[in-house]
């Protein structure tokens, strides 16, 4: 799927469940929750968890968790962006332009 198609699918999915009704302050909380889960997945992938109460995951399972948590972050970010009429493509283009302008050699 292309990014625009993915964003539309996420928006439709979230709308069907009433999840788009949450305001931006609640949505940013969900985004931060998912960012924390991504941080935990990165840690597990890089150095492991060392938790006797958890099953030790394979590197492939850890990689899959990274992918899923990145998707959760992007999903929440896309829904938040949509509240302001912004697409992820818009945000990435603005980010690219900002970096080029900031770091271009003169």
PLM-predicted stretches and their roles:
Residues 1-70, 74-106:
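Flexible "arm" and connector segments at domain edges
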């Amino acid at each position: 799927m292309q990014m625009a198609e993915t964003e539309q699918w996420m928006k439709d999915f979230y709308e069907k469940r009433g999840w788009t009704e949450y305001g931006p302050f609640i949505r940013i909380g969900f985004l931060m929750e998912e960012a924390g889960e991504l941080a935990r997945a990165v840690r597990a992938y890089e150095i492991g968890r060392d938790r006797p109460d958890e099953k030790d995951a394979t590197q492939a399972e850890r990689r899959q968790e990274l992918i899923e948590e990145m998707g959760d972050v992007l999903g929440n970010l896309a829904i938040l962006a949509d509240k302001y009429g912004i697409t992820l493509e818009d945000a990435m283009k603005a980010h690219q332009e900002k970096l080029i302008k900031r770091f271009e050699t003169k």
